[in-house]
């Protein structure tokens, strides 16, 4: 349910970008249909106007300048806040006079980020939004995204490989693998259903007997495993148990699927 910040997670080729393109009618699904408030999205300009997708594909010609792109966006999205867009461009150091084709990979991402943060659409689909950004600009983006959601709650679908960085923002996780949805639940609920255990390999193996480990790794005589099931209140003697984090859980789940 929306509003909310949804994380769309998956390895390369899992189908994340394909799914986003289907949601925005850039691609047509082989089966099924996309509905918004119970209404089909295909050939529905009113419904599509409620969505804004940030992706690698440019909305405007490469020869257009950033300033001109902002002005064009105001024509298509009445809620677009061009004054705020200019202010954010200044914060990121984005030159409004630059042609889109002249922007570096990082600044192309920044240009798209500024549009997404100010367009005013109730549904934002962000496909790898921080591609090419340095750590400082990524941090600024995450802060601005939280500010946007706090001021104007909307539905944000964030596709990213930087799970550890984005995890604090994600309230609901959708995990894809080879075109299939493996998990689709609140992040807190997913992580409550798995835990880690570590210690001497023999003791860990004994602990895993009768349980379902997702993955395990060994270093010397020590072993660590991700285990499905709630974390026990007290760890067995000689072992340490802990909560799972979203990135570790994702990696463990991918390892389980690759078996």
Predicted regions and their residues:
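ABC ATPase "signature
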Residues: 184-185
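Helix-to-loop junction immediately C-terminal to a conserved catalytic motif
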Residues: 24
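ABC-family P-loop ATPase nucleotide-binding domains
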Residues: 53-112
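Catalytic Walker B motif of ABC-type/P-loop ATPase nucleotide-binding domains
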Residues: 124-128, 133
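Walker A (P-loop) phosphate-binding loop of ABC-type ATPase nucleotide-binding domains
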Residues: 11-15
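Conserved ABC transporter NBD signature motif
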Residues: 1, 32-47
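C-terminal coupling/interaction segments
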Residues: 212-215, 219-259
């Amino acid at each position: 349910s929306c509003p909310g910040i949804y994380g769309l997670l998956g390895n390369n080729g899992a189908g994340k970008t394909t799914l986003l393109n289907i949601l925005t009618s850039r691609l047509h699904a082989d089966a099924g249909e996309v509905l918004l408030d119970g209404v089909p999205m295909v050939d529905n300009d009113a419904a599509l106007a409620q969505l804004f997708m940030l992706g690698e594909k440019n909305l405007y010609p490469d020869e257009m300048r950033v300033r001109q792109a902002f002005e064009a966006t105001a024509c298509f999205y009445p809620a677009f806040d061009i004054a705020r867009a200019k202010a954010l461009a200044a914060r990121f150091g984005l030159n409004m006079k630059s042609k889109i084709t002249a922007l570096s990979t990082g600044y192309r991402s920044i240009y798209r980020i500024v549009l997404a943060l100010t367009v005013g659409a109730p549904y934002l689909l962000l496909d790898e939004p921080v591609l090419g950004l340095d750590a400082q600009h990524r941090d600024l983006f995450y802060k601005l995204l939280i500010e946007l959601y706090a001021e104007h709650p909307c539905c944000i679908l964030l596709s990213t490989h930087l799970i550890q960085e984005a995890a604090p923002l994600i309230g609901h996780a959708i995990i894809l693998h080879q075109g299939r949805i493996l998990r689709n639940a609140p992040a807190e609920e997913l992580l409550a259903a798995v835990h880690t255990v570590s210690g001497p390999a023999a003791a860990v193996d004994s602990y895993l007997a009768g349980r379902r480990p997702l993955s395990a790794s060994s270093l010397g005589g020590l072993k660590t495993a991700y285990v499905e099931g709630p974390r026990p209140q007290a760890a067995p003697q000689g072992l340490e148990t802990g909560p799972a984090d979203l990135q570790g859980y994702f990696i463990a789940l991918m390892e389980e699927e690759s078996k």
